[in-house]
Amino acid sequence: MPKKNKTLCVDDLRHAEYYGMQPVFDELYHRSLEGENFTDLMDLILSRDNILLAYRNIKANGGSYTAGTDNKNISDIGCLPPETVAEKVRFIVTGSQHGYRPKPVRRKDIPKPNGKTRPLGIPCIWDRLVQQCIKQVIEPICEAKFSDNSYGFRPNRSVEHAVQKTYTMLQRMNLHYVIEFDIKGFFDNVNHSKLMRQIWAMGIHDKQLIFIIKRILKAPIRMPDGTTLIPDKGTPQGGIISPLLANIVLNELDKWVESQWQNHPLVKEYGYERKIRNSITFDRSKAFLKMRKTGLKEMYIVRYADDFRIFCRNKEDALRTKEAVTAWITERLRLEVSPEKTRIVNVRKRYSEFLG
């Protein structure tokens, strides 16, 4: 893991411990792991310590000095007393009779190496602070339910971990057929109604919080030419909560792919526990040998945000898997897979690029 990423993780943990929030987040994680639903999260989100922790975490990010449509940045918050910061966040979220209304998001086009641009949405700094407050509380709840095969924008996970898992698939497991998937404009096309149901399925049943997340997704977008758009889909890149929401959307894909092979019911039937040194592990090898004699498709997923690969043992499985996954994404997530950019690669004959 790069030292920079490791330092950020350590800093986040140190900040959470300083404000006394780490035990709270740990408890949320374990309660979520036990299948508990959460109906009253707003008091925790708007607690003084969570707000001050959010400020500290945002300040550590260089992007906090980039102004939104109100021309303010983190320095405008830093000059205020802590109690004033906490009171203002609470007022922004709950003070209006119309509920929380985020200010317009500033749209900025970032050049890409291929000559195209990537749209970036920059919320106003106070709205970023609200998003960070929400993220800190719901992230441990979601982490308890996220797939082990997802590596992007998650605590203590990195690009290096995803690449290492990829090498394991190719070199140790001999899964040489790689399906390179491309979802057209993923962040701009996330279905809001579907996302709300997925958040609910995570165990987040606080209706006031879900209403606020809807408002964040519907925040007006101020375009470079000065016009304003009201989005009916998508979660803008640049929003603090957007990567977490993206993982919530695609976690359903992770779990479905795993259910087709890694966590298929036959694995539980034929797998068994065995002791290796001082630990107990669940051995799937016997189950997999039996499953390969059936018509099941052997497939494994490695995902980093919206960039993912599926690994298969032979071309026939790869062709069937490509068709099945494409149909599933279209029907269940209401997203479009690019037929031009999605392809099957035999890595023994051709190169497959993943995460650079």
Regions inferred by a protein language model and the residue ranges of each:
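Intrinsically disordered, low-complexity and often Lys/Arg-enriched segments
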Residues: M1-L33, P265-K290
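Conserved polymerase palm-domain catalytic core
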Residues: P104, K145-N149, R154, H161-V347, ...
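Conserved pre-catalytic core of RNA-dependent polymerases
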Residues: T7, H15-I240
